[in-house]
Amino acid sequence: MPKRKNSGQSTDLNSRSPKTIDEALRILAPPQALLVQSQLNLTAPANPFSIQKAPGTSSDNEQRAPKRRADEEAVNAVPKNLLTTSSTFARAVIPAAPAISSANNKMAPQSVTATAKTTTNRGKVSGEGEYQLIKNEVLCSPYGNQYEVLEFLGKGTFGQVVKAWKKGTSEIVAIKILKKHPSYARQGQIEVSILSRLSNENSEEFNFVRAFECFNHKSHTCLVFEMLEQNLYDFLKQNKFMPLPLNAIRPILFQVLTALLKLKSLGLIHADLKPENIMLVDPQQQPYRVKVIDFGSASHRSKAVTNTYLQSRYYRAPEIILGLPFNESIDMWSLGCVIAELFLGWPLYPGSSEYDQIRFIIQTQGLPPTSMLESASKLHRFFKEVKSESPNHTNVGGSYYRLKTVEEYEASSSTAKSKETRKYIFNVIDDISRVCYGFESDPVEHLCDRIDRQEFVDVLKKMLVLNPDFRITPAEGLESKFVTMTHINGYNFANYVHEAHKRMEICRKPGPAMATPYRAANVATPITPVEKPPAPKLQQPMIAVLPQLNQIAATNIPPVPTQPDLTNLMHHYSQMAAATGSAATAAQFFYQPLPPAPLFQYAQLHHPFAARPPHFLSLATPSHMVPQFVPVPIMDPSMLQGQWPPGAAQQFAVLANDIMRVPAPQGINQMFASTPQTFSLPQFLSSSIPSATTAFNGNAPNIPFPEENSSWALGTAAQQQQQQAQRAQSMINGNVKVKPLAAQPKKNSPAPSVITLSSDEDSNGAGSSNSGSTTRTGAVNPVRNDTLPMGNTIKTEDILVPPTTFDGQLPNLQYFPGSHLFDPKTVAGLLPNPFLDTSHIPRAFN
């Protein structure tokens, strides 16, 4: 009695399985809902219809495409559907529903896309028990339904699948016709029994194919399914086996995990999960909406029998290869191999034999546990026991197992030879994240993709655990970070995250409430389009915000309440009245309100003798690191294009004074005023050096610290100390001694003042331990680290200066090489914008 090659299913039937095929016919309910396609391992050496192959140029991947089979005999692959080449990678092109002309029925389609072979054997059975179909043949069911054959879809070891039209309606269905043989009839009973249990569940919610009815046609079992569009293998083949992005793999993984979770709750094992058995429902309306098909190899958990030929080889779990007892966890292994293939565009373990399959697995996963090997019925087929005289922690009883070499296996087996069929050879699963990188010009998009890859590899490793007891379950997979996307929630402003949420919402959305997405061309049935999910609200692009002019008086511009996150970083144009005589002419000013907290905490001030841990410059959250949202609170009017009326520069003032935490705009140095204000160092910076006794006694001098270590308080403290003696000195560079700052005449063009701090080398003398003049800054430029050519700003040395250099004269400023000095007014809130043209930026911002 021949055995079904792709199944190896036991002859023991489920307790709920029918005893005869007539009982099986009555289990399935009559047609009720949507129609989809169901096929199994469709291969066809002899095709009763001429197949239209999709045009396209063959690529290297297409020529090297491995054959998708479970048995080890060579069978030519055949497309499961008529496809057309699509230039769009994200979705496949759906061909129009074929139709056959009929003068007697007004509901019949009016065209046909497949032609039948000329034959006189109508409805004959071949020598292998396969039914020979012809064009326009009508299959009648006992429920009064008639199905007219439209198109041949494919065939396999079980039989064949055709596309048919349900006469009197506009519905297109898929009919699977099994071979006329007792073994296939029994397998059909098992599939009907499982489908009858699934018919009570919501197929749209749990993402598995919907079956409508089962009947006999000339002693052949016929199963009627709803019609689906295209399987994932054909989708990959159509796109030249290009890898799928993670945003496309995620919804597929989510839907298949949902189906496996339902099967696990029913105690069912699919046992043949592969890309051919995951079908795209409607790529145009619902991209990456999939359903699981082919329950011909499925069984109940209690009826699972070891040493059976289950699963296609590329997706076969190690417990099946070794001949161990199995459960629903074999489907999780298969799903892991499927998503790895979608990510790589090539099977992860494309073994040409079971030996190659287990050899590829061991190369990346290591040897299976000893407990598994000792219980394996096929142990000596692939492994060799090695005796050892010195037992250790790696072996039990002085022996261990190793995989046979290729030469040893070929010498012991005459059926199959080892072949290298892998496109990518990995030593560890983590190396998968290093291949198939796409080009992302946006650093935020690249960062999201990199983080997403790490979580994808993490869930993949949990699905490909050798020990089935520790393999991840469907429920745990649905709670993983890769599926829930909790790891990228902080990047909701990125297009990558927006696209990920959009695709997940589409796959969660139920399909159209109609009988089938396939209808005859001449039937004027209104088709309700699938509603597009509302896109989440994003920040307006800058080009859309700039033309908006806001009238402002003496108050600040309030933030837009409907825009979260980066609202206070959006750029606005404002109009101000320039006091030019009696007529106030309008002038545009570039206004940017400051954020509540600076992007960089660039003034973490501490006294060197204070008993406090060191503080370093910390970055803000990733949502504030977008270049287009870097704040520019104060800007030179000459930086903006256009004519500026007289008096505009004098009217330019800081508008966000309350956000900058200063009493009034007049309290901050007017950088563009005719006479800039002068500043002096605060008292705590100009105090004398504390004595060594005080330092070694551990008593910190009574020096006021800036409030909450905030840079804003530094600017305020600097303004309050303007009347005291100045200690500001100008630093030239190198070892040149510092000279007191000489009074200089005022100039018409203002120049921002810059604090330059130095040690008291002159007062300490040449014999002092402090050699050389060194500076520290109160701010750090986050981008620029090149040497500044001139002016009042200097570049700090590339070597960190010991805290003893400054002693008690200067608070403990933490800085990095390449940091720049800033004016105390700058420290008070004038954060530079490194993305502007430096030729127009004031000196203090360089």
Curated annotation (Swiss-Prot):
Predominant localisation class: nucleus
Induction text: Induced by heat stress. Transcription from the hpk-1 promoter is not altered by heat shock treatment, suggesting that heat shock affects hpk-1 levels through a post-transcriptional mechanism. Induction is greatest in hypodermal seam cells and neurons with much lower levels of induction in intestinal cells. Induced in the neurons during normal aging with significant up-regulation in older animals.
Which spans does this entry mark as compositional bias, Basic and acidic residues? Answer: 61-72
Q: What happens when the gene is disrupted?
A: Enhanced sensitivity to heat and oxidative stress with reduced survival under both conditions. Following exposure to gamma irradiation, no effect on DNA damage response in the germline but significantly reduced embryonic survival. Suppresses hypoxia-dependent expression of nhr-49 in the head, intestine and hypodermal seam cells. Significantly reduces lifespan with a rapid decline in body bend movement and pharyngeal pumping, indicative of accelerated aging. Premature accumulation of polyglutamine aggregates and increased polyglutamine-associated paralysis at day 8 of adulthood.
Set out the biological process GO terms recorded for this chain's protein.
autophagosome assembly; determination of adult lifespan; response to heat; response to oxidative stress
Tissues in which the protein is found: Broadly expressed during embryogenesis. Expression becomes more restricted during larval development. L3 larvae display robust expression in many head and motor neurons, and lower levels of expression in the intestine and the seam cells of the hypodermis. By late L4 stage, expression is largely restricted to neurons and is maintained in nerve cells of the head and nerve cord during adulthood. Expressed in adult pharyngeal cells, hypodermal cells, gonadal sheath cells and distal tip cells but not in germline cells.
Which residues does the entry assign to the active site, renumbered to this chain? D272
Write out the biased-composition intervals (Low complexity): 764-773
Region (Disordered) residue spans? 47-74, 741-790
**InterPro entries per the record?**
Kinase-like_dom_sf (IPR011009), Prot_kinase_dom (IPR000719), Protein_kinase_ATP_BS (IPR017441), Ser/Thr_kinase_AS (IPR008271), Ser_Thr_dual-spec_kinase (IPR050494)
Q: Does the keyword Nucleotide-binding apply?
A: yes
EC number in record: 2.7.11.1
Localization, per the record, is: Nucleus
Q: Where is the Protein kinase domain?
A: 147-483
Ranges of Polar residues composition bias in the record? 746-757
Q: Which GO terms describe its molecular function?
A: ATP binding; protein serine kinase activity; protein serine/threonine kinase activity; protein tyrosine kinase activity
GO annotation, cellular component aspect: cytoplasm; nucleus
Q: What role does it play?
A: Serine/threonine-protein kinase required in the somatic gonadal cells to regulate germline proliferation during larval development and in adulthood. Plays a role in the development/differentiation of gonadal distal tip cells. Required for normal lifespan in a pha-4 and mxl-2-dependent manner. Also contributes to survival following heat or oxidative stress. Prevents sumoylation and inactivation of heat shock transcription factor hsf-1 which enhances hsf-1-dependent transcriptional induction of chaperones in response to heat shock.
Q: What is this protein called?
A: Homeodomain-interacting protein kinase 1
Lineage here is: Eukaryota, Metazoa, Ecdysozoa, Nematoda, Chromadorea
